[in-house]
Every structure is written in C-alpha cells, then in structure tokens.
C-alpha cells in the first residue's frame, strides 16, 4: 500500500483516501486579481480540493536576456517577455489577499514556486504544500532546498526520464519523506497517445512508499478519469473561465462545466473501484434468485443410489439447491431419498455433503 501523507491540514492522500484534485489556475487569471478570485470560487464550487497558482520572482527565474527578448506571440501581454511575465505576476500582497480569500470560502490554496526565491516567499506564506513544476524537477539544488523546508511536496515529471526520477527520489526521500510524483507530459494541449498513463503503474512499482498522481494537459476529462482508475491519488488539471482568452494554457484547460464533470466522474470511479474481494453481493441476490442455476436430477434417482455425473444436469431450479460448481463433489455421494426426474437436488437428499447453496 502506498504511503499515506497529510498533504493539507486534515486532508490525507494515498492509500484508500479520495483522490486530491488540484485546480491549476496558474496564470490563466490574465493578471487580474478579481478574475483570480472568480477562479478560486469556481474551483471550490466545482468540488476541487485545492486552487493553485504559479509564483515567480522573475529576476531569479530568468536571466536578463530572457526577460529582454522581444515577445510577439498572439498571447503576449507586452513587447518583451519580461513585460509579458510582469503583467501576469501578482505581488506578495496580492498573494496574501488571494490566500485569505481561499481560506474564507474554504478551499486549500498553494502555488508552484517557479524559483528558489518564490519558494522562500511561499514558505513564509505558510502554504500547505509545495508544488514542483516539471521545469524544476531536475533542478537538484532547488529540490534540496525545497525539501529541507519540511512541507509536503507534489513533484511533476514532465520532460524527465525514469533515470532522472530515480535520482529525484533519492535526493528528496532522505530530506523529506512526505512527497509524491505526478506522471506528466509537458505539451499543451496533450495528444492522447503521449499521455503514457502506464507510467503511473511503473512509478507505483519503483516507488511503492509514495503516492503517485497525474498532471494532465489534454483536452476533455476521459484521460484524467482513467488515471484515477489506474491509481492516481493526486490529480491536477489547468482551469480557465474561457478557453478563447489570450494565453497559451487556456486551450488545454477545463472550463467550469468540465471541471465539475471531472470531479463528479472521479468520485464516481472511486466508488466503482470498490473492493478487490470477489463475492456474491447483496445487490446481486435478486438476480441470483431469478437466474442462478442449481444441480437438477437428469433422470429419476432412487434412494440408495450412488450419484454419477450422467444422472445430473444444471438448470434454473425451484427451489434453489446445490450451485453448479458443486456438481463434481456430488458425484460418488449416496442419495438418501428418491429424487424425481427434473427435481432440484437438495441438501437433505444427499448423504454427507456440506451445503453450499448460495443464499
């Protein structure tokens, strides 16, 4: 059983706990704090467990040339990449305001720290857990410093190899045992054949003591629901209020109706996973009573006869008798009373045979 960890106060993940659903707002708020609040409320109303943002301290995430390069994309909010990113970046005070709003309406709030200084700020903000974006998963100094903070970590694995993920595990585990990996492919939108959900099972084999989850960038909800069926214990999906808005993430994000349907479907699948024990269930009793078959006499069998298989057949019988799987065990047993042709073989009719009648 994968390790269970308390990802947020009172909210555990792993084991038999419900999948933890993260609504990734990222920077789909368009740099507008009122839109950001609407998205937090949407995440709450749709049933997500957590609203998540992306926090950067731009001078620590990008070098000067990266910030100064021209940015002429249709998604641009400025002439340079730096201007574009600054438009989308909330201040520390705005983050505190958003956190307070999330607490007020009752949803967990966190962010990906996109650089070491952002992690420092989020630590001061007292977020319940750190999200490590795929771009920092192989940033080992960052991982070490983040792990040493002692907060739970959710680590995405887009753009990484299995060898790299093994190294990540070896680095983080001794410093902070409370973390999980998310299978992720960094493409927007993600094509189904590139989702590679089987990696979830491989992670479960290689890292049996941590929960495994899925971060999806595909369109629709089917692949994410399948990930939960495969055992994903944390599920992250980008959300938007309008897929047509400016920004490269919107097309791979879920609108409110889709997010609500995702949450409903995940909870339905979790109920459907049920128990690994195969048994006749109470809900099957009516069908078993109507359609369940019993061992029936193929011919008239006089009292004192030793049963052979050619004397017996299987039919829907009234009343119910021995189930079909008992027929081989009945062979060789002595009949105590005469059984008429086409009658059900009952317990009291056969010598020394324990009753296995399904009821």
Curated annotation (Swiss-Prot):
GO BP: any one term: glycosylation
Tissue distribution of the protein: Ubiquitous.
This protein's GO CC annotations = cytosol
One of its Pfam families is SAF
Q: Which SMART domains match?
A: SAF
Q: Where in the cell is it found?
A: Cytoplasm
**PROSITE patterns, per the entry:** AFP_LIKE
Principal subcellular localization? cytoplasm
Assigned EC number: 2.5.1.57
Residue list for modification Phosphoserine: 275
Query: Which segments constitute the AFP-like domain?
Result: 294-353
Q: Which reaction does it catalyse?
A: aldehydo-N-acetyl-D-mannosamine 6-phosphate + phosphoenolpyruvate + H2O = N-acetylneuraminate 9-phosphate + phosphate
User: Which is an annotated GO molecular function term of this record?
Assistant: N-acylneuraminate-9-phosphate synthase activity
Alphabetized InterPro entries for the sequence: AFP_Neu5c_C (IPR006190), AFP_Neu5c_C_sf (IPR036732), Aldolase_TIM (IPR013785), Antifreeze_III (IPR006013), Neu5Ac_N (IPR013132), Nonulosonic_Acid_Synth (IPR051690), SAF (IPR013974)
Lineage top rank: taxon = Eukaryota
Q: Which CDD domains match?
A: SAF_NeuB_like (cd11615)
Which purpose does this protein serve, as stated in its record?
Catalyzes condensation of phosphoenolpyruvate (PEP) and N-acetylmannosamine 6-phosphate (ManNAc-6-P) to synthesize N-acetylneuraminate-9-phosphate (Neu5Ac-9-P). Neu5Ac-9-P is the phosphorylated forms of sialic acid N-acetylneuraminic acid (Neu5Ac). In contrast with human ortholog, has no detectable activity towards D-mannose 6-phosphate.
Under which name does UniProt file this protein?
N-acetylneuraminate-9-phosphate synthase
**Gene that codes for this?**
Nans
